[in-house]
């Protein structure tokens, strides 16, 4: 099994899932991707890095959170082939000994998925805002790591300087 994040949380790097799938096919391996930092806003319809890289049918297990972009307070999901999910339900100790999600979180999460299926307006707006922010920060002279992800690393290269920036942002209510 090859396991990767779809998008990496520290810098927004998007995994080359198409190449990972090719590697998995060469070695007859499964592919699992954690979409916690991609579900809802990466890919044309927000289905994450598998959609973004054009490999939806080639990823065997997808995990994600109902928090972050999807707005839930807790919980997550694992999706995959029926046989894999049945095995995980039987053998995953954390699953066996955990509590179920509150019905309100499940209901709200279902509505978010429905909303994302019906329109890309919010996702498109986030993409536009991210592009604007990246361009504006670059124009202002900041070193921005290239990418399309809404996680936008601003490279300051010195911890004391980063602390000063953080303090100033807090002072301004940001």
Locate predicted features.
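Active-site phosphate-binding strand-loop segment of PLP-dependent enzymes
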Residues: 1-33
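General beta-strand structural signal in soluble alpha/beta enzymes
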Residues: 2-4, 31-35, 63-64, 97, ...
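Short, small-residue-enriched loops and turns at beta-alpha junctions
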Residues: 6-11, 38-41, 95-96, 154
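Conserved PLP-binding catalytic core of the aspartate aminotransferase-like
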Residues: 15, 124-133, 138-172
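Active-site PLP attachment segment
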Residues: 45, 51-87
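PLP-dependent aminotransferase class I/II
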Residues: 70-137, 142-145
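A common structural junction motif
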Residues: 96, 171-174
């Amino acid at each position: 099994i090859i396991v990767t994040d779809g998008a990496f949380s520290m810098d927004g790097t998007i995994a080359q899932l198409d190449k990972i799938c090719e590697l998995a096919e060469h070695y007859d391996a499964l592919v699992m991707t954690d979409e916690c930092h991609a579900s809802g806003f990466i890919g044309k319809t927000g289905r994450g890095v598998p959609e973004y890289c054009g490999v939806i049918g080639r990823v065997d297990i997808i995990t994600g959170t109902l928090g972050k972009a999807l707005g839930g307070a807790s919980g997550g999901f694992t999706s995959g082939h029926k046989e894999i999910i049945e095995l995980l339900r039987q053998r995953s100790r954390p699953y066996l000994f955990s509590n179920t999600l509150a019905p309100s979180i499940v209901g709200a999460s279902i509505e978010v998925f429905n909303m994302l299926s019906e329109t890309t307006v919010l996702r498109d707006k986030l993409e536009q805002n991210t592009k604007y922010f990246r361009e504006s920060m670059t124009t202002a002279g900041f070193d921005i790591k290239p990418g399309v992800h809404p996680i936008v690393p601003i490279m300051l290269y010195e911890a004391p300087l980063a602390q000063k920036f953080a303090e100033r942002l807090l002072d301004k209510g940001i």
